[in-house]
Amino acid sequence: MEAPEWLDNAVDLGTSIMAVEYDGGVIMGADSRTTTGAYIANRVTNKITPIHERIYCCRSGSAADTQAISDYVRYYLEMHTSELCDEPDVKTAASLFQLLCYSNKNNLMAGIIVAGWDKHQGGSVYNISLGGSMVKQPFAIGGSGSTYIYGYCDSKFKPKMTKDECIEFVQNSLALAMFRDGSSGGVIRLCIIDKNGVERKMIPGNNLPRFWEG
């Protein structure tokens, strides 16, 4: 018997991811749908990956590629901490991702958002594109769902948001992306990072913000 066509497709994080600076830290958010072609392989994937104690990344693109890169960077940061007896900066982690993505740009499909808190810069967000460029931004969005929400994010973002304002901004942005993008869906996962540590939240699909649906 011939195998289904979707078995020949790579597992893909066709996705909606974002990270936003607020007054005191950063908030990262992602949907949870993983696709293999048109087939939904996983409805509850965790696309927010810990890299160090207060540094996380959001992954989009090939699931295998982004997981492998994350493992490499986590290892290098552990070595960094052991050798220097000091916590790494968010920029250090982002630079490692950028180096790996750029050096292997012809072989990888990986879009990464790195965010976290360190004692030098506080909360910061870095966007590493598919080609390996790195840009520091007050907020970053990525994945297939991001194409639907650029205008919304540009109009609603404001510097120095409070924690609650930032959570609402991230939830609404991702809910809009998930509604429009067929490769995004499931639940919204949030990761709130500040000087006190990391807080994880999950918003089930039936509790997502509702907008006009026609």
Curated annotation (Swiss-Prot):
Pfam families: Proteasome. It catalyses: Cleavage of peptide bonds with very broad specificity. One of its GO terms (biological process) is proteasome-mediated ubiquitin-dependent protein catabolic process. One of its GO terms (molecular function) is threonine-type endopeptidase activity. GO terms for cellular component: cytoplasm; cytosol; nucleus; proteasome core complex, beta-subunit complex. It is an enzyme of class 3 (hydrolase). Coiled coil: none annotated. It is found in: Cytoplasm; Nucleus. Residues 1-14 form a propeptide. Keywords: Cytoplasm, Hydrolase, Nucleus, Protease, Proteasome, Threonine protease, Zymogen. It comes from the Eukaryota. The 26S proteasome consists of a 20S proteasome core and two 19S regulatory subunits. The 20S proteasome core is composed of 28 subunits that are arranged in four stacked rings, resulting in a barrel-shaped structure. The two end rings are each formed by seven alpha subunits, and the two central rings are each formed by seven beta subunits. The catalytic chamber with the active sites is on the inside of the barrel. The proteasome is a multicatalytic proteinase complex which is characterized by its ability to cleave peptides with Arg, Phe, Tyr, Leu, and Glu adjacent to the leaving group at neutral or slightly basic pH. The proteasome has an ATP-dependent proteolytic activity. Belongs to the peptidase T1B family. This is Proteasome subunit beta type-6. It comes from Dictyostelium discoideum. The lineage of its organism: Eukaryota, Amoebozoa, Evosea, Eumycetozoa, Dictyostelia.
